[in-house]
Amino acid sequence: MKTKTAIISIVNLKVEDLTVLRPVLQALPGVDKIDFNVERSVAVIDFDPSQSHIDDFLRAVLKAGFQVS
């Protein structure tokens, strides 16, 4: 499987937000790995581009009640 990496900036990301965001993003098809950097307010997602697209991740983050930058 050839993977791509998406880096999404999330406004004011906090450690406690990860309990909401991680399952939301992991539920999307093709997600292989998710890392968060709270200091930089980013989610780093490795995924299979034949199953998902960065727009899917952006929509999921927004739907979960967060803002992206």
Pin down the residues of each PLM region.
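Short amphipathic alpha-helices in soluble, non-transmembrane regions
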Residues: V20-L25, D56-A64
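Helix N-cap motif at beta-to-alpha junctions
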Residues: D48-S52
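Short, surface-exposed ligand-recognition loops at beta-strand->loop->(often short) alpha-helix junctions
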Residues: I8-D17
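Short acidic amphipathic segments
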Residues: L25-N37
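Short, ordered beta-strand-loop transition motifs
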Residues: M1, N37-V38
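Short hydrophobic/aromatic patches at helix-to-coil boundaries
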Residues: G65-S69
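A generic structural motif
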Residues: S41-D46
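Compositionally biased, charge-rich low-complexity tracts
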Residues: K4-T5
